[in-house]
Amino acid sequence: MRFCEGSIETRVPSFDGVPLDVNVALPADSVADAPFPLIVRMHGYNGTKDGPYLGGDRGPSTYTMYTDAGFAVMTFTARGRGASCGTDASRRATPEACARGWDHLGDARRSIRDVQYLSGRLVDAGLVEPAIGVQGGSYGGGRGLLLATLRDRIQQPNGHYTPWTSPEHGIDMEVAAAVPFIAWSDLTYALAPNGRALDYAIGSDTLSRAPLGVLKLSIVQGLWRQGQAHYNAPPKSDPSIDLSTWFDAFPSTAPLTETSRHAAREFTRHHAAIGVPLDRPPAPTLIANGFTDDIFPVTEALRWVHRVREAFPEATIAQLYGDFGHRRANQTSAALLAPRALTWFQRHLQDAEASAPAGVEAFVQSCEGGFGARHHADTWRELSAGELRLVDSTGTTVRSDAEHRRVSRLIDPPSGRSPEIPSSSCRRAHRAPAPGTASYTFAPVGRTVTLMGSPTIVATVTVRAAHHALIVGRLWDVDPDGKTRTLITQGIARPPSAAQETGGATPFVLQLYPNAYPLADGHRAELQLLGRSTPYVRPPTDPFEIQIERVDIRLPTVETPVKEPAGKDQNAAAVSVPAPRVLPPDMRWAPGYDPSDR
């Protein structure tokens, strides 16, 4: 390949003059063969143009995977990081240009505009085609999904959308292929979920803010610590990205403030694909999220897919899910994603007859290392055919002060960095008692059952709280001896505000993060509901109690209902026909889920 490496001295001024540190790699072919199809690779939150990228790529391998296949590749350090005004040295070199070159955390009006402007410069130079590809993970993935959804539009500083054209010659441009992985679609919901998202329904545009959710504290604290190395806007200096103020603006149980509402609006409207108006289909997108990624779970992908499919049923989307992503995930996505990404770009940027991914691929979690069985279907719904179901009306109370702290720390996603806690998606813990929490234990399964999808809890609750309450759900795999259990998945929600206002019993639907998990013969599923989970969830500042009067727990399975043969344990948990889904009054069915269509 031919490689142009940027430096502080050769930075490229962006659309607003902020200097950006850029690398460009071209295939070894003659320049006479230009223009080449371009792939923009975008780094993660704590990275720079040098990576790390997918699979920990740094150095030449960042580029050669694609340049060897005839693509041009551009990488650059996002504004406010590294030599793009992030270091003291870079700001001293160009103090005026860097004065407001702080981190904008994927804002479509600036961070995304940088990608569009830089690639437009290469188009104007005649080096690359105006239909580009984008790829990135985590922070790069969130930006990639936003670019795919914008497709051929720019979001101006005033929030309006205009056609995307190259800066000098006005050539029409678009994203023609995107591979975002372990990404968010709604940054507000990803970092502070309220539990209203359902994998079979679509909510209003304010779903993630009504009510405002509960902060994933250990995650956001970790990001904030890493972000101290960036150039951040001084407090109160930029209302579009006031991170230092916003960090404390997501309370757990205290009253909400206008600052918290403003932060949530900014994140959803300008930092997230879910906030982009869908007046055209997105670019062909291969989206990949991790079942065991407790930062950006599969929920983030499904919300975007359902929204797009509702508006554009024929949109080109492929989905890939498995045990990869941010901790506690096993972080081994390269073997799955790299070859699929290459064929995706070959198909959509080079018109090659490549066998590109299609439909939904889901790999079962394996505690033995690597990936478990592969399942494929045309849609998310078709991956599961039955369910394990448990209904309990005995009633119990969940308190805001109750948890087993050691267990909570053990399953906290970033805790895998600690020497005493293995970095594994299969977090195991003793079945420690925790008074003030609720547990619901299924009968043991009589054969191995593959859980596939989002565990669903339909509950009737009464909340007693001065302001707000929260609830954490954990689904466990309990060993046959009943002493040890493995975390399958978890989730966070706010119980309905109506219950807080009236003190009366209110129906509530909560889904935990989706997973594909093998529940072995003789093992039991166990749901635990708590009022706190420290340090993953910001602890309550005001006491509350949640009276759970009835729960209907549904665990979707790959297996279909079958009549167990004579001699089988008739007390074993059996796969049944899925019960009718419950649609909250402020939501509508996602494509393929409306019972009246069947």
For each feature predicted by the language model, list its residue ranges.
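N-terminal cap/lid segment of alpha/beta-hydrolase-fold proteins
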Residues: 1-34
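Glycine/threonine-rich phosphate-binding loop and adjacent beta-strand/alpha-helix elements that clamp
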Residues: 6, 10-11, 352-598
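Cap/lid segment of the alpha/beta-hydrolase catalytic domain
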Residues: 34, 38-117, 121-123, 468-472, ...
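Alpha/beta-hydrolase fold nucleophile elbow
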Residues: 126-139
